[in-house]
Amino acid sequence: MIYVLLVLGFIILLGGAELLVRGAVSLAKSFNISKLVIGMTVIAFGTSSPELIVSINASVSGVPSLALGNLVGSNIANILLILGVSGLIYPIKSENKSLWLDWVVLTFASSLFIIFSLNHNIDFNDGILLIGIFIIFMIYSYLRGSGYLSGANLGDDKTPNSEVEELSFMPQSKLNTVIFVFMGFAGLAVGSELLIDNGVQIARSFQISEVAIGLTVIAIGTSLPELAASGVAAFRKETDLAFGNIVGSNIFNIVGIVGLMGLIDHLEIPSRVLQFDMWVMICSVILLLPFMFRWIRGLGRAFASMFLLLYLLYIFAIATDVKNIFDFVSNI
């Protein structure tokens, strides 16, 4: 029954995120907000909303280790698992010359996350700084996408537009829009509660840590919106969108959600996460370097298969309770 409730939690959570995105997009359109801004804010928030709500719920429920595992695990899964699957569907190329700037921000944010974690704690001051970086990045992204920054626009705005147009079934009246938003938040709340309660029970029944459940099962589940968005983008051959979804979501997870966790309550960092999982996370980001700078023309099926193999090795390392990155490398 626990597993049924866990799966039900995933379904309700993802359904809530979908309803929230559709309702929020409709609400934004009613205020004549451009598709560009909608795509860069509402859609980006929608794909990361499961991580956000699950992490907040876990933190206030007294299991912050599950929240931490969810965030770090999602960032690893987004790159190795989701880009791996997307690359198998269609070779992913970074054609947008400005996308490397987002990769630099992600690398900086990931490095800052590790530095802040060296004292095994993300506190209020760390949270303030991360949220400040998030706000600056959002303002910069808007100015770049709107063409206010010369030579740094998005190239074309079909990326955000195509995501907005993809939402064909939209609430038509303001009442339905409010209902969609309300039901979306309700679905996120109920789904996250089911995920956390049953995820913790499963962890305890197998005598494994809550952070391990967060790094694997919960992380993969909350990354499903990114899988759907990047998978569809790869199928439609919109390769920049596949890269952009992952990089943007990972930035949001670190500077947005981790920052918020620091503001709500200090986030404790277990030694194993600091000595192993965070290094896997930053190494995954570095793996994107040759693709972002176009030293390698694209993430084809060979590299996609390598990404998936690395993710399987990472899951194996968690299952065998590898304590740090040096043990992992020596055992390969």
Model-derived features: positions:
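Hydrophobic alpha-helical segments, chiefly the membrane-spanning helices
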Residues: M1-I332
